[in-house]
Amino acid sequence: MADLSFIEDAVAFPEKEEDEEEEEEGVEWGYEEGVEWGLVFPDANGEYQSPINLNSREARYDPSLLDVRLSPNYVVCRDCEVTNDGHTIQVILKSKSVLSGGPLPQGQEFELYEVRFHWGRENQRGSEHTVNFKAFPMELHLIHWNSTLFGSIDEAVGKPHGIVIIALFVQIGKEHVGLKAVTEILQDIQYKGKSKTIPCFNPNTLLPDPLLRDYWVYEGSLTIPPCSEGVTWILFRYPLTISQLQIEEFRRLRTHVKGAELVEGCDGILGDNFRPTQPLSDRVIRAAFQ
């Protein structure tokens, strides 16, 4: 799938047959038929899928999460590519930024690969995860891969301790200065397949608290096909803030290439690109705060 970015060439699980791999690679998908992903992407039927609803009362306080401070060693990225892939906006980071500490295996580093956005057509929805069944207008994902154990993100997908995703909820309020570099060029990549290089992007501006102490952790999956498991999720308690004008720039984006003929009943607007929450099953949500 040419539009799936880092998972398009992901290494398949060993037990999959070659024809199954080819079938997954060649199938388009969308959010309107999200419940059917499992028909083509078997991992989407797994027991430990994402996103989930975070019930704050049921989260288990784990003080050991603070024994080793969660440490993002992020650097400013020069000449970052921002792409509309028809499903989301991706910011591909070329500079080597790494994450370690907190709930992550000791001595292992996770390299930041990209930032992805999920948003609603209206402010009442948009985030993939919910907190006590409350949705936010947007959710950002900072996607990392284990560069200690694997040679590439393709190798890390679907493996235990392979992927770590930091999720940040977004609410409407003041303009987010750190995201201006992205929102200001969205009009230039309105259609699927369009990309633009921005001169500078600082992922540190996305972190809500310099102490990084208020977060939840659970084990889950990618939220887009192939929905591979083995993903550690770190969700920050306090949301970022962007302006109404900034989120409206996302809502002008399109799911199709310019000039494409749309199917009946489809307006081509890119929005509501979030997967429904999945059953928690027997998983435990840990909290680094009380």
Curated annotation (Swiss-Prot):
The keyword Phosphoprotein applies. One of its GO terms (molecular function) is zinc ion binding. The record marks R116 as: Ancestral zinc ligand. The active site is at H87. Residues 27-289 form the Alpha-carbonic anhydrase domain. Keywords: Metal-binding, Phosphoprotein, Zinc. Signal peptide: none annotated. GO terms for cellular component: cytoplasm. PROSITE patterns: ALPHA_CA_1, ALPHA_CA_2. The modification Phosphoserine is found at S5. SMART domains: Carb_anhydrase. Does not have a carbonic anhydrase catalytic activity. This is Carbonic anhydrase-related protein. It comes from Rattus norvegicus. The gene is Ca8.
